[in-house]
Amino acid sequence: MSDHNPLTLKLNLREKIAYGMGDVGSNLMLSISTLYLLKFYTDELGMPAYYGGIIFLVAKFFTAFTDMLTGFLLDSRKNIGPKGKFRPFILYAAVPAALIATLQFIATTFSLPVKTTIATALFMMFGLSYSLMNCSYGAMIPAITKNPNERAQLAAYRQGGATIGLLICTVAFIPLQSLFSDSTVGYACAALMFSIGGFIFMMLCYRGVKEHYVDTTPTGHKASILKSFCAIFRNPPLLVLCIANLCTLAAFNIKLAIQVYYTQYVLNDINLLSWMGFFSMGCILVGVLLVPLTVKCFGKKQVYLAGMVLWAVGDILNYFWGSNSFTFVMFSCVAFFGTAFVNSLNWALVPDTVDYGEWKTGIRAEGSVYTGYTFFRKISAALAGFLPGIMLTQIGYVPNIAQSDATLQGLRQLIFIWPCALAIIAALTMGFFYTLNEKRFALIIEEINQRKNKEMATEEKTASVTL
């Protein structure tokens, strides 16, 4: 990159692809737990479903605070070496993340309390290593580019990478696991393959992405976990985005956790999950590709809200008419196409709130903003893991037998009605309370640049007087 106006400077395609590879890697490791770990607990380890829900709640709540710890570490960095401010965390945390992602799917013959303890500890350790790796990855966008359109494109590439990782996991994990006559061995081997793949993609991201604008933390600014919370509540656009994301991520993860049960017990075809994943994730990829163009034409907020409408419509159609394989896949494609815009813009909007925070406080703290934001995401993920486990117990789910009509109806409500309701809440929150539009953002960036130019001129004048 040459030294031009950072607001108009464009990134090369290679760097955008490399950044997207980071979320391919992250999601290859994360999605195996999001999609299949609860089922592994209930069907292979013999845990009651509510045990699995409690494990998700405890571990995800713990990792919400490890996200804060990551922000503290990022914002505390003073002596930044040639690897950059964020990239070293990607490099060094990817190894334990991949290792623990595999260990979570190792079946043991211990008693139920011991199994539960081990599962909880492993999930918490995975969350810690994943926080160090993924929060740093997400917080890196403002250091890569200051161009708002390029940020939207990076977010689209990130969401595209996440979708590819999720697609591979949805389509390939169960077929790989089914290759082994012993299902417990199948889970372990499939998890190992996905973890190795995830690690490789994280290394490709590390090698291909550069931090072009590294802002060191001011000397008088001391990072703290408390400041991560303050970064949220003193930044209204960030707070609104956090609340909306709390709803959207919970809705999305509930759908992912329940779809394996829905295809097996409601539609009586667990292999349909691979086909559904192929088509619906394909629709997400199409949506992701359309994000930069639609944002340029209509603006981020309008595209976000349109995605929420599509999501809700798809779920409503599926609840009433998705009783066979064809209509289930078709209406799921509509819903997932809508999520492409929502999930992409969840990340594209965060860098804008970083700049808003700098404009308002004079302190640029990407780590605090991003980890405050991911704190809400982890709370959302905790609820998304906890609620299915509890609700599976409430609706009378028993593994590996034909389910009652009441249980089947409960599964339909879990996968369609709950996510739809959360999507509507998120849409109302963003529609009425998010006020950081493109025009206002441009004025904020202009004022920040004027401040910095004034500070530089003052420093140069002081230096010349001293000499």
Predicted feature locations:
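Membrane-embedded alpha-helical bundles of multi-pass transporters/translocases
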Residues: 2-467
